């Protein structure tokens, strides 16, 4: 039986996390910035147009345990923020409209 679209989406997020992690299974700041630029260029562009420099603060905001790395739960929190922004857009909000950003 093949995976559903939802299952493929989750597997894709896990694969994205693994692509940018180090040997310890966590993402360091340079890799997180690369991941954001490669995978969310439209989101970042919309934020930049509003004068919101998302990349300047995202690492510090998401590194909840302050270990200077992003673990999987912190990564999911980041994706949740981006998904929430796209959800707001589906209801007419402007891109990068705030909230948990």
Curated annotation (Swiss-Prot):
Q: Where is the EF-hand domain?
A: 13-48, 50-85
Keyword annotations for this protein? Calcium, Cytoplasm, Metal-binding, Repeat, Zinc
Gene Ontology biological-process annotations: endothelial cell migration
Give each disulfide bond as a residue pair: none
Q: Which PROSITE patterns match?
A: EF_HAND_1, EF_HAND_2, S100_CABP
Q: Assign the protein's first listed, main location to one coarse class.
A: cytoplasm
Q: Which residues bind Zn(2+) 2?
A: 28, 38, 66
Q: Found in which tissues? A: Overexpressed in psoriasis.
Q: Give the highest taxon in the source lineage.
A: Eukaryota
Compartments (UniProt record): Cytoplasm
Q: Where, in this chain's numbering, is Ca(2+) bound?
A: 63, 65, 67, 69, 74
Q: Does the keyword Metal-binding apply?
A: yes
Under InterPro entries, the record lists:
EF-hand-dom_pair, EF_Hand_1_Ca_BS, EF_hand_dom, S-100_dom, S100/CaBP7/8-like_CS, S100_Ca-bd_sub
GO CC terms on record? cytoplasm; cytosol
Q: Name one GO molecular function term.
A: transition metal ion binding
For the ligand (Zn(2+) 1), the binding residues are 18, 87, 91
Q: What does the similarity note say?
A: Belongs to the S-100 family.
What does this chain do? May be involved in epidermal differentiation and inflammation and might therefore be important for the pathogenesis of psoriasis and other diseases.
The name of this protein is Protein S100-A7A
């Amino acid at each position: 039986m093949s995976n559903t679209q939802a299952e493929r989406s989750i597997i894709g997020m896990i694969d994205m996390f693994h692509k940018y992690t180090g040997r310890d299974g966590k993402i360091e700041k340079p890799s997180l910035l690369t991941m954001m630029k490669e995978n969310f260029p439209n989101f970042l562009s919309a934020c930049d147009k509003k004068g919101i420099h998302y990349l300047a603060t995202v690492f510090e905001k998401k590194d909840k345990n302050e270990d200077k790395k992003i673990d999987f739960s912190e990564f999911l929190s980041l994706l949740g923020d981006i998904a929430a922004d796209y959800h707001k857009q589906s209801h007419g909000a402007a891109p990068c409209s705030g909230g948990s950003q």
